[in-house]
A protein has these predicted regions:
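Histidine/acidic-residue-rich catalytic or RNA/ligand-binding cores of hydrolases
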Residues: 91-93, 140, 169, 220, ...
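Bacterial N-terminal signal peptides
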Residues: 4-16
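Active-site gating loops and adjacent loop-to-helix segments of metal-dependent hydrolytic enzymes
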Residues: 88-109, 167-182, 218-228, 284-315
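Metal-associated gating/positioning segment near the N- to mid-region
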Residues: 74-145, 149, 167, 230, ...
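Divalent metal-dependent hydrolysis catalytic cores, especially in the metallo-beta-lactamase
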Residues: 114-138, 154-163, 206-217, 245, ...
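Histidine-rich, glycine-flanked metal-binding segment
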Residues: 23, 37-77
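His/Asp/Glu-enriched, well-ordered alpha-helical/loop segment
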Residues: 99-101, 241, 314-399
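Histidine/acidic residue-rich metal-binding segments in metalloenzymes
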Residues: 193-288, 312-331
Length: 421
């Protein structure tokens, strides 16, 4: 009996020792830590496997075998979160949107998306909210799975799959009425088709549902609302009942109001929002993802020489409406519509947010804790906090002193794995 007891004790000790030896610890020692809310000094961060084990002053004992990474002159931050991305698109000055949808095979588009995912991760963005494959069907679900399995490097993906548009509202447009072209999103007409599209996209892996609440649908190509209030309410109700969030592409005041009143979690773009609309967003707790970088990129593709030519009316108007949103106290997400411009250049949006009137501290919050909160992932990412996922980056210098320092990536850790050092 005594021998059996000793054997059990020895086995338990050996198993515990083996488990401890299997654990991987990394201690990060930067000059400062942005925890997702505030900049902290005198902090270190201990990572255990894929989780943040400790964050704060060095008051704890290091486990044996801990890897220590000195980050002198550097700032540690939560992995950045891109709030509006299209990994299956590439810059429109390389290939037009129509030609990407119509002429590039899905195999080519997926191959490009693999490269885009890696570039995004190495730029310090460890999570992306990818808001539609733009004609590549459900291939974002496969890309997401390949990243999760470790087949390819890339960020965590929050995916919308195909997105939903009103029949006849989107593109590409056919010049021959007898020819139906492939579309950049799933077309629907009426409540029954709405329900079918929502459930189909969820069944294929959608983490959220994206709807185009307005588009260039008017008789002269101007933006107009594309769904009625009843249809918008139906879409959001069906989405929310599945435990998911609905988000809306919207730029017109009426399209924005219909989406806000229906209960979407965020408005994407919001170019022509008014003081009234932004007050409604604040009241309803709806966030704005402004996509400043996409607008600037498109104007530059059209010939605008930034810093030399006067700002086009689109940019002047965007500055004005962004200020209205800030003054109304609307929650601002960080999302630039990457894909319109190069993946890996995601920090461009953060720089423009400062240029358009936000403080660097608010921009850092938007790209970390705020995005995590709005997207429903605050229990996992967006902060440097004990128990959260070890998605951590380090940049040279202090991004509060100069937001451009966010580009100087020195370290990228996602889920405890070092991808750049």
């Amino acid at each position: 009996m005594k021998k059996n007891f000793l054997l059990i004790v020895c086995l338990h000790f050996l198993m515990t020792l083996a488990a401890q030896q299997a654990d991987k610890y990394i201690l990060l020692k930067p000059d400062r830590v942005f925890d997702g809310v505030q900049m902290q000094t005198g902090w270190v961060v201990l990572v255990k496997n894929n989780t943040i084990e400790q964050a704060g002053a060095m008051t704890f004992k290091l486990p044996a075998g801990t890897q220590i990474i000195e980050l002198k002159g550097q700032t540690l931050l939560p992995g950045l979160i891109e709030g509006h991305s299209h990994l299956f698109l590439h810059p429109y000055n390389e290939t037009s949107w129509d030609d990407q949808v119509l002429k590039e095979s899905r195999a080519e588009r997926t191959a490009r998306a693999v490269n885009h995912a890696k570039a995004t991760l190495l730029a310090g963005f460890t999570t992306v909210r990818d808001l539609g494959t733009e004609g590549a069907m459900y291939d974002d679900a496969g890309l997401k799975k390949a990243i999760e399995k470790g087949v390819i490097p890339g960020p965590r993906m929050i995916i919308a799959t195909r997105a939903i548009v009103a029949r006849g509202a989107y593109g590409p447009k056919s010049e021959n009425p007898d020819v139906d072209l492939p579309q950049g999103a799933e077309e629907v007409a009426g409540l029954e088709e709405l329900s079918k599209a929502i459930r189909s996209q969820i069944g294929h892996g959608a983490d959220l549902i994206k709807v185009y609440a307005d588009y260039r649908y008017g008789p002269n190509g101007e933006s107009q609302p594309t769904f009625s209030e009843i249809e918008m309410g139906w879409l959001v109700g069906n989405t929310v009942s599945s435990g998911r969030k609905a988000v809306a592409h919207a730029s017109t005041p009426e399209g924005m109001k219909r989406a806000i009143n229906a209960g979407v979690s965020s408005i994407e773009h919001g170019d022509d929002g008014t003081e009234e609309v932004f007050k409604l967003m604040k009241e309803k707790g709806v966030a704005l993802c402004p996509t400043l970088a996409a607008g600037e990129a498109v104007e530059q593709y059209r010939g605008w020489k930034k810093g030399i030519d006067p700002e086009p009316s689109r940019i002047v108007n965007k500055r004005k409406t962004f200020q209205l949103a800030l003054q109304a106290g609307v929650t601002i997400c960080m999302g630039g519509d990457a894909g319109v411009y190069a993946h890996g250049d995601n920090a461009r949006e953060m720089e423009l947010m400062v240029d358009y009137g936000m403080k660097p501290l608010e921009v850092l919050r938007a790209a970390t804790a705020v995005n995590a909160d709005v997207f429903g992932y605050a229990n996992k990412i967006g902060r440097i906090k004990k128990g959260l996922a070890a998605d951590i980056i380090a940049v040279e210098g202090d991004p509060l002193a100069d937001i451009k320092n966010i580009r100087h990536i020195k370290l990228v850790i996602k889920d405890g794995t070092i991808y750049k050092k």
